Structure formats: structure tokens, C-alpha cells
């Protein structure tokens, strides 16, 4: 039974990222536990948690009160003075709620001060006063501050302001939480209240639930401040009393102020914001004189005609299939129009078609949307759902009214252009991206809490590394999984204290960022529906509600996702088609390539899948080698199988064994066989792999509609036993109607229940398999262009470039080193099929200076020497560091001089070039010749030096600037060791599979060393030996390590003799060392 004595009107959730500790749903649960009839949320300058709070309180049967704590200035003149006060705004009704949205949006747009943060002014308050109750801010409000400063005239001014604009909507706030001057303030407020007739209200400025949370709260605040407990405790301005007191505790605290308690109930009764969550508000799509429904039907039918010609070039084939396609099309259109979503499809159609027309790559599809034929004929997707048995109901279910969700992949580099286009079409004030929130994860909370306690960085780094990277990892799970972490927790008091506090902070909101792809388009101003958050400069608006909450406002989310692979595909096709621009027959359209290319699948079976979408990881390569996919359906299955569920359940082994005839194909197993299952499960060798298969089995067996079947699938995923039992009975009865006995139907239902957790969305699997196939096809037939484009997409990521260059070497592609007379910023392919290294992949040289070099070269075709380069390019950008990096990388080898000479003379050349340029500016023509004569004389001295750097030093420069050895390898200088010692081979011979014995001696350079102690307290070493682009792992056990430890240093050239083993699946060699030289 609710206690109607008191209501908390000032409460911070963890979305007050400075001082909030409690999640909104926990606040609601705790309020219910305390029998509170209502509760407010008043986070600091935001409504981030409002939707979660509103829904949670309603689910608990508690009334939600919506409010915000603001910093406020008297007017704009005071902003620079930092003399702000505090005030709390509570929404009385929906008008007040809308004014909160407008005030918050305005505050983030133009109310930001580096020292204060987000603020509002009193002038804005007046403009947005309708439907708002104000709480004065207590000691920190304008009246409180001026009272305590004995500034009577300002107190009177403030009272006059509130009486004029907020009569009956302004409350003098008092609290007793243990801060200084509270009682002095309260005694004066009592007089003002009596004299002015302004009511008083009691609050507790709640930041945590229980008194014992105070110490943890202190850590939370210091994490936000970025300081330690010892160094900056003065910044902490909170008290142990700021917990959620009970009604009785608040009554006892204010026995001398009974009205201050009863007024909380009065305010709660006045606050009645009603939010409706079951409506959708789509922007208007311009259709001329036609209504939206008819326009969609017209567009779909026109698109269908074009797609049928594309699918069935043969007229008779087209006639044979037209009824099947139009039946499906009309069925989908009927559902879309009945559910009221024609505008949604037209909006998505427009921006996708605009992107395609403007040379912005768009993905072939993503998620369940690929199951829609309407999407296919509108050019939203590039997948024919009928060809792959994809189901529309998996995407849009007429028996479950939810907005459709068409995720769209765009080229990473040009995605923002599509968002800009949408903003122009619908108006900048109607389009926004969506916020996302970072939380204190298991790893980050250890580091953050540890920093507050002052633990050393190295210690915290080691501790956090013990926490696995798995998705959804918690500290509790980490302790149970990692023995080393458990032992530290048990026996190290500091670690135990750190983890115990970290556990209590784990998962709370830490910071804000922008969602990767979410965009909302509103029919009116977005601020009519949600508040906006802007960056510090008042730019880049995002909604204050996250992707999970935005739908409850009625606004529709569109996903504009960036996919780097589309950039790679687009870049590859562009290179190819530019080369063959005069030969139409050789031009390629990546969306029309055959999906039945046998060469493609033979290539796939080699598992040479570096840079192939979704197929790059070692685990995936192992699966490819085992599965040996030989059809597109197998590739679709591959994408679906490579997930923890199938891999851990044994499903993958069954699938592989059935494909290769090592296990009998049953539909699906010995106990549940039935003829109705074979057509559904044939493509997956009798394994239930896809969600669509679950739905079709339910439809065929138990007469479910596909929409109803999707509801069952969702119920199975959620493991909702109450709903499951209802469906179990329905399934049994439906099966009876098809003369299927109860025993068999029960077994099949149980099997479906088991597989529903592992089953994957086939629409998504087909979509991504198509992108995988396209990249595989390009890598097979146009390897140079593909690899160049892949490197261009990652040109800022040197580690990735190194992997891709090594792959080029494996593929025996020719790489032309960086060359200032040949290279551009990006990698490119010349007419002889050589990949020319991109200057943008050289470490430490900015894009602008590289573009200057390339542009200068265009004007003169080539640079004759380094001096010529320096005088031809913007002298401010051609610094000593830039020239050094160009020399070290080999970019200046084209001048025909040893890198040692160039490095020795570069300082003088730069200096001479600058003097020469100055003389030109000063127009001292007589000085030109003298400078050049002097330069040429001195240059000869520099160029004739005999002290050359070693090849090892030059190669080290190369590695330093490029991240890898490109033109040679330090091992090259030690090939004589092969002659000195019998049977010593180089690593590249291993790569070429020239091994005929288990005992081997290999020459290489140590590139990685890791010393470990085994469980039996023995020492061992993991070592990587490398030679050019080949690496091998070497393991050295304790007995060998004791003899050769003195030889183990990074970059040492060494001969390892030992036994070589090759993994059956990964085909990687491992050497167990027996002797080192």
C-alpha cells in the first residue's frame, strides 16, 4: 500500500554522469519498495533516462514526474562571470514537457560555457514557462545564494521575478543533508515564505539509494572529475545524507516544516505528463497528386517489370515466373499498406536511389529487410528473396505491429553525404542522428576505479588484461573464468577492495557518443518530440534518447550504417572500369556477376581469405578448410555457422560430416523424421540452421500463418515458458489436423525449441554472404586492383597495411615501393599490373603534404632530384622530418642515389631550397645563378661521401617508416649461414611446402618473444621467427631454454633446429626447438 506522505522531487539517475549512481529502472523498483506513490527524475541538464524511467515507474504502478536540474544565469551578460545558480524544472503537463525539450535543446545549442557546462538564462525560462513548476535550488538557487550573501536587494529582485512570471508555480526549496549554512538558509526562507506567501517544499537531492552507497558515490564523482581521492577531495561537494530516505524519515527531518512535506504530494498531484507510446510519426513523402499507397504500388509494379527482365532475360522463363512474383509482390504490398507503412518504404527508396545515382556505394541488403520483394523491386536491396527462400514475415509481421527496420550499408567515406541529402529534403530541424551511451565495462571500471585510488598504471593494465574481451563480460564472470584473477581477488587485499567497489559501479553510464548509424527523420521539428544534444560548439545534433528509447516517442529510426568493404568493392570496380573505359565488354557490374562460378569456390577452399569480407579470421579459415564450400548456399551457411552457438553445440560438426558423406543426412534426425521436412531442410543437409526454417516447419506442420510462426520463433528465443506452453498446445493441435501424431509433433516442437536459440536470420546471412562472394570474386579475377583498393580503405592503419602487403607477397603480386615520381597518395595499379605503393601509407607524413607533392609533380611530370622536389612543393610543409621519412621509405630512390647519401645531404638540400625560394620572392635574379652554382659544387661533396649505412640500418628505416621490410629483409644478409650449416632452410621454403622431414633447421629473425611460467612452475618461451613475409611460431621448453636463453633477443638472426608440426586444420607450422645457433 502506497504511503501518500511524501514524494521525492529531486532525484538523479546514472544519466547524471557527474554524480548519479542508480539506473532509472532500479530507482522505480526502490520507490515501490518504499511505498512511494510517485517519484521524480531530475537529471543534470538532460532527459537521457526519461523514457526508461517513465516506463519503469508505470510498470511498478508509480506515477512518474519529469524534471531537469539546470544551471541558470540571470541573463547573457553574466555568462562570462561564471556566476550561475541552480534551479529545478518539473513538467506539470504535456505543454511543460515540450518546454523542457525546447529548453534543453536550446541550452545545448547555444548555452555552453567551458567552465560551467550547459546552462539556461532567466529570459529563456520566461519564454518557456508554460506548464512548468520551479523548485528554487535551495542554498544554490539565486534566492539562496543572495540570502546567504546578505544581498537583500537581489533577493527582492528575484522574488519579484518569480512572483511576476511564476506565480503559484514557484516553490522555495529546503533540504537537510548536512551542508554548511543549511539552517541559516532555512530560517530566512521561513520568513520569506510567510511574508510573500510562496510555498516551501522539502527535497533530499538524491544521488544514491542507501546511506552505505556514499563511499562508492565518491568514487563515481572522482572518476568524472579525473582525479584521485587523495589529491582532490575538496572538489567533492556531497554528503552521506543524499540517499533515498523513506517518507517517515523525511517527515521526522522536517517536523518543524510539515507544509514542506505535504507540498511534495501537492506538486506530485499537479504534475501529469501523459506520454503515448503506440503511435508512429513518419515524415511526408512527396507523391504529387497520388496518395502514398497508390504511389508505392505504382513504383513497385514498375520496378517489378525491370527486375523480372534482369532475373529472366529469356521471355518464356519470364512468363513462367511472372504469376509467382506478382502474387508475392501484391501480398507484401497489401500488408505494408494495411499496416500504414508505404511512406517508410518510399523514404528509404529515395535516399538509396539518390546515393546510387551520386556514386555512393550501397550494400546489397542487411538483416531481415532482404526478405522483402518490395524492397528488391524498389532497388532498396539487391537480393531476390524468392531465389533464396527468404520470408517477408521475418521482416514485417502483420500479427506484430512494429515499425519496419531497414538497415542500410553505405560506403564508410560517403555515408555522411546521404545524411546531408536527407537533411536537405526534410529540413535540418527535422533530421538528427541518435545518441549512444558508454558505460563502465568490466575492463574500464577496473582502470577508472584504480586511477581514483592512485594505483600505478602498469598494475591496472595487467589487472584489466586478465578480464576476457568477450561480449557481455562482467567482473563476476571474469573472476569465475580466470584462475589468476580469482587468486588475486582471494589473496590480495588491495585487489579485492578495488574489484568490490568496481562491481558496484560496473554498468553505470559513463559518457555520451554518437550511434554508429541511427538517424531519425521527423514530420515536424525534432524538438517537438525529443530534446537534442549538441557538441561543445553547438554542432552535430543527436537525440537525447538512445536507439532503444527513440521509438517510444513515435519517431522512426533509419539506420545509415558505414561498411568499409563497400568502399573496397567500389574502389576496385572503379579501377577496373576506368582501365577498360574504351571496351564496354570488359566493364563489370558487381551486382550481376554469376553466383555459380566454380573457380570462385575452388579459390575459397584454399582459405586465402585475407581482405575477403567476413572470412578473414583464423577460426573462419579453419571452418572453410573443413567445410569446403562449393556453392553459394554453402557460403550462406558458412556465415550462419560461424557463431558461438553452432560452434559449441556440435551443429557445425554435423553439418560438415553430412555434407561430406561421413554422416547420414536425416530430416532432421532419427527420432523426428518426416517427409514434410525434407524440402525445408535440404539445402542445409537436414540441419535446422535458419530462423526462416523454423518458421516454415511451424507453418507446414501445424498450419500456422508465417506471421504467427514468427511470433512463436520470438517466444522460443526469449524462452518465455508461459507463452511457450500455449504454443505447444496449438502446435500439437495443428499437427493433428495434418494427421501427424502427438508423439512426433511433441518431439519436433522440442527440437525447434532447442534450435531456435542457435538459428540465424537467413536474410542477413544471404546479404553478407553476397558481399563476401563479391570480394572473393574480385580478389580472384582482379587481385591487383582488389588488394590496392583494400589497402586504400585502410591507408591510415599501418598494421592492416602490413597484413595486406604480406598477403600481396603470398599472392606473388608485384609491389613497386614508394616513389615520389610515380606514387600517388593512394595505392594504384599500373598498366603492367604492378601495385604502386601509396605515399599515404608512409608513417609520419600528413595527407596535405603528400597531395602537394603529387600536384607539383603533375605540373612538371617528374622531379629530377631531391632539390627539385623541395623547391617545387610548399616549403612550409616540406620539413626535414617529411624528407627523412620519404628517404627512409625508399620514396626518393628514383633519384638514383643511395639512401645513406640522401639522408646525409637532406638537411643541406632543404636549406638550399629555402634560400633559393626566398631569392625568387625577393626577385634577386642575379642571386639565382650564384645559389645554384654554389649548391651544385657543395652537392657533389655530399654525394661523394663514402661512409654508407649498413643494409640492416637501411632496412630498419624502411620498417620504421612503412611498418614492414619491403625491398629486402635482414635475413638476406645471412644466407651464407645456409652454406655453413648443413640442411638449413629459409622460412619461405616452408611456405612453399618443401618440407619432407619432421626434423628441421630454419634461418630467421626473432620478431616476438614471450616468456611464460607453466602450471608446473617450468619456464618456457613463445617466439615468432620471421623472414620477409613469412612467420613461424617456435616453442622453447625449460630444458632447452636453460642452455640457449642468452641468444634470445628481438631482431637477432638465429638458426632453430627442432621438430616441426603442422596443424591438420589451420595448416600452420609450429617448431618445437631442440637447438639454437
Swiss-Prot record:
SMART domains: POLIIIAc (SM00481)
Predominant subcellular localization, coarse grouping: cytoplasm
GO biological process, one term: DNA replication
Subcellular location: Cytoplasm
One annotated Gene Ontology cellular component of this protein: cytoplasm
Superkingdom of origin organism: Bacteria
UniProt keyword Nucleotidyltransferase present: yes
Keyword line: Cytoplasm, DNA replication, DNA-directed DNA polymerase, Nucleotidyltransferase, Transferase
Assembly and binders: DNA polymerase III contains a core (composed of alpha, epsilon and theta chains) that associates with a tau subunit. This core dimerizes to form the PolIII' complex. PolIII' associates with the gamma complex (composed of gamma, delta, delta', psi and chi chains) and with the beta chain to form the complete DNA polymerase III complex.
Designated name of the protein: DNA polymerase III subunit alpha
Organism: Buchnera aphidicola subsp. Baizongia pistaciae (strain Bp)
High-level lineage: Bacteria, Pseudomonadati, Pseudomonadota, Gammaproteobacteria, Enterobacterales
Gene this chain is encoded by: dnaE
Amino acid at each position: 500500500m502506497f504511503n501518500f506522505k511524501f514524494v521525492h522531487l529531486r532525484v538523479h539517475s546514472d544519466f547524471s554522469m557527474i554524480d548519479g549512481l542508480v539506473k532509472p529502472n532500479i530507482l522505480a523498483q526502490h520507490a515501490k519498495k518504499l511505498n512511494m506513490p510517485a517519484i521524480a527524475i531530475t537529471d543534470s541538464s538532460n532527459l537521457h533516462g526519461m523514457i526508461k524511467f517513465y516506463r519503469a515507474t508505470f510498470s511498478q504502478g508509480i506515477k512518474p514526474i519529469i524534471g531537469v536540474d539546470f544551471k541558470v544565469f540571470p541573463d547573457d551578460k553574466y555568462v562570462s562571470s561564471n556566476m550561475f545558480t541552480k534551479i529545478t524544472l518539473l513538467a506539470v503537463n504535456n505543454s511543460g514537457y515540450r518546454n523542457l525539450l525546447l529548453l534543453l535543446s536550446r541550452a545545448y545549442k547555444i548555452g555552453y560555457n567551458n567552465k560551467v557546462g550547459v546552462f539556461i538564462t532567466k529570459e529563456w525560462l520566461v519564454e518557456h514557462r508554460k506548464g512548468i513548476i520551479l523548485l528554487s535550488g535551495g542554498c544554490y538557487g539565486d534566492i539562496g545564494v543572495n540570502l546567504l550573501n546578505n544581498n537583500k536587494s537581489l533577493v527582492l529582485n528575484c522574488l519579484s521575478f518569480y512572483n511576476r512570471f511564476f506565480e503559484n508555480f514557484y516553490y522555495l526549496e529546503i533540504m537537510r543533508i548536512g551542508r554548511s549554512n543549511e539552517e541559516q538558509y532555512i530560517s530566512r526562507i521561513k520568513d520569506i515564505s510567510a511574508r510573500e506567501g510562496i510555498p516551501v517544499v522539502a527535497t533530499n537531492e538524491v544521488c544514491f539509494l542507501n546511506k552505505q552507497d556514499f563511499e562508492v558515490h565518491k568514487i563515481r564523482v572522482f572518476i568524472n572529475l579525473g582525479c584521485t581521492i587523495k589529491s582532490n577531495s575538496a572538489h567533492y561537494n556531497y554528503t552521506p545524507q543524499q540517499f533515498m530516505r523513506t517518507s517517515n524519515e523525511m517527515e521526522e527531518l522536517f517536523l518543524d516544516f510539515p507544509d514542506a512535506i505535504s507540498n511534495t504530494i501537492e506538486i506530485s498531484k499537479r504534475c501529469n505528463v501523459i506520454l503515448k507510446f503506440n503511435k508512429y510519426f513518419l515524415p511526408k513523402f512527396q507523391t504529387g497528386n497520388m496518395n502514398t499507397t497508390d504511389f508505392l504500388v505504382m513504383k513497385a509494379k514498375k520496378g517489378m517489370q525491370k527486375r523480372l527482365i534482369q532475373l529472366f532475360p529469356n521471355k518464356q522463363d519470364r512468363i513462367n515466373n511472372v504469376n509467382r512474383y506478382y502474387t508475392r509482390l501484391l501480398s507484401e504490398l497489401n500488408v505494408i499498406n494495411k499496416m500504414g507503412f508505404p511512406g517508410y518504404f518510399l523514404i528509404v527508396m529515395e535516399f538509396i536511389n539518390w546515393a546510387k545515382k551520386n556514386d555512393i556505394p550501397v550494400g546489397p541488403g542487411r538483416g531481415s529487410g532482404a526478405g522483402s520483394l518490395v524492397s528488391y523491386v524498389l532497388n532498396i536491396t539487391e537480393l531476390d528473396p524468392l531465389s533464396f527462400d527468404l520470408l517477408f514475415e521475418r521482416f514485417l509481421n502483420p500479427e506484430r505491429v512494429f515499425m519496419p527496420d531497414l538497415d542500410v550499408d553505405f560506403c564508410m567515406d560517403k555515408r555522411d553525404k546521404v545524411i546531408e541529402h536527407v537533411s536537405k529534403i526534410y529540413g535540418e530541424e527535422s533530421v538528427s542522428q541518435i545518441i549512444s551511451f558508454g558505460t563502465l565495462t568490466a575492463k574500464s571500471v577496473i582502470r577508472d576505479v584504480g586511477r581514483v585510488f592512485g594505483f600505478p598504471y602498469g598494475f591496472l593494465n595487467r589487472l584489466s588484461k586478465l578480464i576476457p574481451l568477450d561480449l557481455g563480460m562482467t567482473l563476476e564472470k571474469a573472476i569465475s573464468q580466470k584462475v589468476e584473477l580469482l587468486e588475486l581477488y582471494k589473496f590480495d587485499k588491495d585487489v579485492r577492495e578495488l574489484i568490490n567497489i568496481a562491481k558496484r559501479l560496473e554498468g553505470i553510464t559513463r559518457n555520451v557518443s554518437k550511434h554508429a548509424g541511427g538517424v531519425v527523420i521527423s514530420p515536424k521539428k525534432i524538438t517537438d518530440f525529443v530534446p537534442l544534444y549538441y557538441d561543445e560548439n553547438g554542432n552535430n545534433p543527436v537525440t537525447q534518447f538512445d536507439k532503444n528509447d527513440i521509438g517510444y516517442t513515435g519517431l522512426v529510426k533509419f539506420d545509415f550504417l558505414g561498411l568499409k568493404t563497400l568502399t573496397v568493392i567500389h574502389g576496385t570496380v572503379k579501377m577496373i572500369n576506368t582501365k577498360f573505359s574504351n571496351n564496354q565488354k570488359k566493364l563489370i557490374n558487381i551486382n550481376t556477376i554469376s553466383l555459380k562460378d566454380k573457380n570462385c569456390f575452388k579459390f575459397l577452399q584454399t582459405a586465402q581469405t585475407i581482405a575477403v569480407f567476413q572470412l578473414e579470421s583464423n577460426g573462419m579459415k579453419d571452418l572453410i578448410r573443413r567445410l569446403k564450400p562449393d556453392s553459394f548456399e554453402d557460403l550462406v551457411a558458412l556465415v550462419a555457422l560461424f557463431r558461438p552457438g553452432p560452434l559449441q553445440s556440435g551443429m557445425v560438426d554435423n553439418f560438415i560430416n553430412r555434407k561430406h558423406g561421413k554422416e547420414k543426412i536425416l530430416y532432421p534426425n532419427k527420432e523426428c523424421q518426416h517427409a514434410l521436412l525434407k524440402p525445408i531442410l535440404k539445402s542445409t543437409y537436414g540441419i535446422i540452421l535458419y530462423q526462416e526454417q523454423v518458421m516454415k516447419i511451424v507453418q507446414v506442420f501445424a498450419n500456422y500463418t508465417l506471421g504467427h510462426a514468427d511470433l512463436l520463433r520470438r517466444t522460443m528465443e526469449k524462452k518465455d515458458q508461459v507463452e511457450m506452453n500455449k504454443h505447444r498446445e496449438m502446435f500439437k493441435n495443428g499437427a493433428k489436423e495434418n494427421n501427424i501424431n502427438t508423439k512426433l509433433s511433441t518431439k519436433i516442437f522440442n527440437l525447434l525449441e532447442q534450435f531456435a536459440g542457435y538459428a540465424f536470420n537467413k536474410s542477413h546471412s544471404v546479404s553478407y554472404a553476397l558481399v563476401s562472394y563479391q570480394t572473393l570474386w574480385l580478389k580472384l579475377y582482379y587481385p591487383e586492383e582488389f588488394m590496392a583498393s583494400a589497402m586504400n580503405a585502410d591507408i591510415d592503419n599501418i598494421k592492416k597495411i602490413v597484413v595486406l602487403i604480406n598477403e600481396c607477397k603470398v599472392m606473388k603480386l608485384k609491389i613497386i615501393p614508394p616513389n615520389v615520381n610515380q606514387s600517388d597518395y593512394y595505392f594504384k595499379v599500373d598498366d603492367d599490373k604492378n601495385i604502386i605503393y601509396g605515399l599515404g601509407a608512409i608513417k609520419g607524413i600528413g595527407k596535405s603534404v603528400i597531395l602537394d607533392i603529387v600536384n607539383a609533380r603533375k605540373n612538371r611530370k617528374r622531379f629530377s632530384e631531391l632539390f627539385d622536389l623541395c623547391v617545387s612543393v610548399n616549403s612550409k610543409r616540406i620539413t626535414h622530418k617529411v624528407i627523412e621519412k620519404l628517404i627512409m621509405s625508399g620514396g626518393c630512390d628514383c633519384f638514383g642515389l643511395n639512401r645513406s647519401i640522401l639522408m646525409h645531404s637532406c638537411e643541406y638540400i632543404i636549406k638550399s631550397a629555402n634560400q633559393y625560394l626566398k631569392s625568387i620572392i625577393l626577385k634577386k635574379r642575379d642571386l639565382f645563378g650564384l645559389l645554384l652554382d654554389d649548391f651544385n659544387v657543395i652537392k657533389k661533396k655530399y654525394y661523394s661521401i663514402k661512409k654508407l649505412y649498413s643494409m640492416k640500418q637501411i632496412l630498419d628505416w624502411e620498417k620504421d617508416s612503412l611498418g614492414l621490410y619491403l625491398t629486402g629483409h635482414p635475413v638476406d644478409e645471412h644466407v651464407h649461414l645456409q652454406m655453413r650449416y648443413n640442411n638449413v632452410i629459409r622460412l619461405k621454403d616452408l611456405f612453399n611446402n618443401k618440407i619432407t622431414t619432421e626434423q628441421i633447421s630454419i634461418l630467421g629473425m626473432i620478431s616476438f618473444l614471450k616468456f611464460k611460467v607453466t602450471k608446473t612452475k617450468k619456464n618456457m618461451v613463445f617466439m615468432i621467427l620471421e623472414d620477409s613475409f613469412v612467420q613461424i611460431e617456435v616453442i622453447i621448453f625449460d630444458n632447452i631454454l636453460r642452455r640457449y636463453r642468452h641468444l634470445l633477443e628481438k631482431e637477432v638472426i638465429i638458426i632453430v633446429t627442432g621438430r616441426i608440426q603442422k596443424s591438420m586444420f589451420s595448416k600452420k607450422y609450429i617448431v618445437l626447438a631442440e637447438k639454437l645457433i
